Swiss-Prot record:
It catalyses: guanosine(527) in 16S rRNA + S-adenosyl-L-methionine = N(7)-methylguanosine(527) in 16S rRNA + S-adenosyl-L-homocysteine. Belongs to the methyltransferase superfamily. RNA methyltransferase RsmG family. Pfam families: GidB (PF02527). This is Ribosomal RNA small subunit methyltransferase G. It comes from Burkholderia thailandensis (strain ATCC 700388 / DSM 13276 / CCUG 48851 / CIP 106301 / E264). One of its GO terms (cellular component) is cytosol. The lineage of its organism: Bacteria, Pseudomonadati, Pseudomonadota, Betaproteobacteria, Burkholderiales.
Length: 231
């Protein structure tokens, strides 16, 4: 009799919590019990809504935690160096990454999520409500059309994206939203040397950080771009 292939069991919340705790410790990110709980609740929301809204190609909650949550947490020590209070815009946020993770891990920050797809904004608003994130806001529309003081409250200390667009395009589209002293941060896989070579005038790489994400065997880089007009 041929044995039927069994589907891998879905990881329990306890298993995910252990993975999250170990990963956050390895990244040097201090999380309270409430913050860990909120991140696990966020994974559950992603898994639930993903079936209908196709927010991510990753279906397994364990891989969601590694490839989305820990990946996003890996930038917290670098962005958090700005201080306990800052404003951030997550461009092309999709399912809320990395913005929702930043809002949970950096509760003193005011984080705005931006996407052009209404159903993704709907999920982001649902997550904001269910996770009780008072420091999170959502705006739908193309980033290049957003007006400080009208569509968004003002300019931002940090503008970040995760696999949103070519680095040069990202900078061109979002630079009008950078506050004085602020910068643009791009989460990338392999080192994007060709994209860096296409940066527009008045933009330059301030730092490029090689990231190591626990349990993830993949190359990751975080690029900070500074602008002449924001110095």
């Amino acid at each position: 009799m041929t044995a039927q292939r069994r589907q891998a069991p879905i990881a329990s919340r306890e298993t995910l919590q252990a993975l999250l705790s170990e990963g956050a410790e390895a990244l040097g990110v201090a999380l309270s019990d409430a913050q860990r709980g909120a991140l696990l609740d966020y994974v559950a929301l992603l898994a639930k809504w993903n079936a209908v809204y196709n927010l991510t190609a990753i279906r397994d909650p364990r891989q969601m935690l590694i490839q989305h949550i820990l990946d996003s947490l890996s930038i917290v020590p670098h962005l958090g160096a700005r201080g306990a209070a800052a404003t951030a815009l997550d461009v092309g946020s999709g399912g809320g990454l990395p913005g929702i993770v930043l809002a949970i891990a950096l509760p003193g920050w005011q984080v705005t999520l931006n996407d052009i797809v209404q159903k993704k904004s709907a999920f982001q608003n649902q997550a904001k409500a269910e996770l009780k994130l008072g420091n999170l806001s959502v705006v739908t529309g193309r980033v290049e059309t957003l007006r400080p003081g009208a569509d968004v409250q003002g300019k931002f200390d940090v503008i970040v994206s995760r696999a949103f667009a070519d680095l040069a395009d990202f900078v061109t589209l979002a630079r009008h939203l950078v506050a004085p002293g602020g910068s643009i941060w791009a989460m990338k896989g392999v080192r994007p040397d060709e994209e860096i070579g296409r940066l527009p005038d008045g933009a330059r790489v301030k730092q490029m950080i090689r990231l190591t994400v626990p349990s993830l065997d993949a190359e990751r880089h975080l690029i900070e771009v500074e602008l002449d007009e924001a110095i």
